[in-house]
From Swiss-Prot:
The active site is at D72 (proton acceptor). This is 7-methyl-GTP pyrophosphatase. InterPro entries: ITPase-like_fam, Maf-like. GO terms for biological process: nucleotide metabolic process. GO terms for cellular component: cytoplasm. Its cofactor is a divalent metal cation. It comes from Idiomarina loihiensis (strain ATCC BAA-735 / DSM 15497 / L2-TR). It is found in: Cytoplasm. The keyword Hydrolase applies. The record marks Y13, Q73, E157 as: Important for substrate specificity. Its EC number is 3.6.1.-.
């Protein structure tokens, strides 16, 4: 019998991905300090935080054992780590700084088997090339989508696609914060496969 699956995230976007994959899961929000360590690269940061989120959920879950998914994401432009904008002004500022540039998103993914006390961590990169945007286009985009809770100030699964001239990476779900191809590969090692009959 496979262990129950828990998503260690409050993100509705990550839940939507798991729903599309026909996975049965519970949600437990982790409560961790997400501060970066000064010498940490973006890849190290998201890997560490994804694992920390998965391990934090173990302390809060109601199951004896489970498979816990932790995930974290940052956007990097010109060597600077970008977070969620939080408000309209910051979103406009972020998007304006991306004009004609490539922004790399790093998504850390952790799958933690609490029974075996084993945690596998992967970091998936994804590049977004922004086209030449006008100030009016940026203002209108922010007005229509309110991307204040999204790293990089856009929702690629919606109108955000109109901001780009190109995408480069293994899995477009990585932009939404949960690389599904890597996740399914990791889950299969724990006996979880949505294509198998129960």
């Amino acid at each position: 019998m496979t262990l129950p699956l828990i998503l260690g995230s409050g993100s509705k976007y990550r839940r939507e991905i798991l729903d599309r994959l026909h996975l049965n899961y519970d949600v437990v929000k982790p409560d961790i300090d997400e501060s970066a360590i000064s010498s940490e690269s973006p890849q190290q940061l998201v890997g560490r935080l994804a694992e920390a989120k998965a391990r934090a959920v173990e302390k809060r879950m109601t199951y004896d054992n489970a498979i816990i998914i932790g995930s974290d994401q940052v956007a990097v432009c010109d060597g600077n780590i970008l977070g969620k904008p939080g408000n309209r002004e910051n979103a406009v500022r972020q998007l304006s700084s991306f004009i004609g540039k490539t922004v790399t998103f790093y998504t850390g993914l952790a799958v933690f088997n609490t029974e075996a006390q084993q945690c596998e961590v992967r970091v998936e990169p994804f590049e977004v090339e922004f086209r030449q945007l006008t100030a009016e286009e940026i203002e209108r985009y922010v007005e229509l989508e309110n991307p204040f809770d999204c790293a990089g100030s856009f929702k690629s699964e919606g109108l955000g696609i109109s901001l780009f001239s190109g995408l480069k990476g293994n899995d477009p779900n990585t932009l939404i914060g949960l690389p599904a191809i890597a996740l399914l590969d990791m889950l299969r090692t724990h006996g979880i496969n949505p294509l198998n009959k129960d």
